[in-house]
Design a protein with these regions (language model features):
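Regulatory sensory and allosteric helical modules in signal-transduction proteins
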Residues: 56, 64-114
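A generic structural motif
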Residues: 142-144
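A short, aliphatic-rich beta-strand micro-motif
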Residues: 120-127
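Well-ordered alpha/beta subsegment
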Residues: 146-153, 167
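Sensory-domain boundary capping and coupling elements
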Residues: 127-140
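Intrinsically disordered, low-complexity terminal regulatory regions
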Residues: 1-73, 77, 156-169
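Short hydrophobic/aromatic beta-strand element in the GNAT-like acyltransferase core
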Residues: 58, 123, 135
Length: 169
């Protein structure tokens, strides 16, 4: 399959951001078309996001394994390998199964600094039905990089990914 990713998405205004997330969701559908393998889909999703969304220094998955998260496909610097559900922004997302939007990670109790350049973070749960299979973690060197529109846009993209993927039992 040949696929070209759009240039960096425009996040400069609320309207541009909404249009950019609609494009991202369409690109996710195109990239995943005909492929249901979970490793391939997580890898492609991470690459697509990292390549097209501005001001990120890490984008990827942590896989749910018991009461901890284990690093999965990602783009960015070498990452923390294991994160207990009891620690950090990713752990809070895994525990609550709710989106975690953190404007300043240094003010977050129990934050795990895998990359000291990260200043804000957005983490979304990835569910297969009711089962937590992973979290999708986005880090930025900018403080307050993410907002509610980012959370909404990524939640829609994650829903497309989750529904188009065959997850291991």
């Amino acid at each position: 399959m040949s696929f070209e990713v759009a240039d960096t998405l425009d996040m400069s205004t609320p309207d541009a951001k909404r249009a950019s997330y609609a494009l991202l969701v369409a690109q996710v559908r195109a990239v995943l078309e005909g492929e249901r393998d979970w490793i391939a889909n997580l890898a492609q999703f991470s690459a697509l996001v990292y390549q097209s969304v501005p001001h990120l220094n890490w984008a990827g998955f942590y896989l749910a394994r018991g009461e901890e998260l284990v690093v999965g496909p990602f783009q960015g610097k070498v990452a923390c390998v294991r994160i207990p559900f009891a620690r950090g922004v990713c752990g809070a997302c895994a525990r609550s199964r709710e989106i975690q939007l953190v404007e300043d990670v240094h003010a977050f109790p129990g934050h795990i600094a895998c990359d000291s350049a990260s200043n804000s973070e957005l983490v979304l749960p990835v569910l297969a039905g009711e089962r937590l299979v992973a979290v999708f973690d986005l880090d930025s060197p900018l403080t307050a990089r993410f907002d509610a529109e980012d959370a909404r846009g990524f939640a829609e993209a994650i829903a497309v990914l989750a529904g188009g993927t065959d997850w291991p039992q």
